[in-house]
Amino acid sequence: MLMSAYAHYRSRDYEKAISSAQEYISLHPGGDGAPYAYYLLAICQFDQIIDVGRDQARSDLALLALNEVTARFPESDYARDASLKTDMVMDQLAGKEMEVGRYYLLRGEHLAAINRFRTVVTEYQSTTHVPEALHRLVESYLSIGLIGQAQQTAAVLGHNYPGSNWYSDSYALMQGQGVELPAPPDAKAGFNLFDRIGKLVF
């Protein structure tokens, strides 16, 4: 049954692969192949993720399935791969929030944009999109006259990502408002996802 599920997966017949894997789990929930069956369910969803410009329902399904693998089989090789794929899905979902936020920002709908960028900062902290989200918040706050909020957000950006180009941009914006912040370093450090996983310092 698992071989059938794998064969369907290899031929990209994801619905049949999912059905076969689910059938195996229902018949053998504690079987030796259960970890792989759950993993197969997850990667069937993961492989169907589309670009950030379209609906991300598949990303949500993939995230749920990947989290189930890591929760049920935390010491398995499948869990380790699922954890890496989870980071990728989170980055995808954050990318969608950023795309919508930028759209609102261009239209001058600053409160709607702020909500999207705040979601990235609070719910997707380990993703590559956080530095830009913080900078876009600075832009948005300045656009509606919230200088204090912009200053606080720029300070958070500078503390957590001092060498990023996004902080340099925010620093320039705040200088234009007469607000002093720590100067960015001359060297523009690249952003490394795995170096920055964890809580932001506010």
What name fits each language-model region?
Residues M1-F202:
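Acidic, polar-rich low-complexity tracts and alpha-helical solenoid repeat scaffolds
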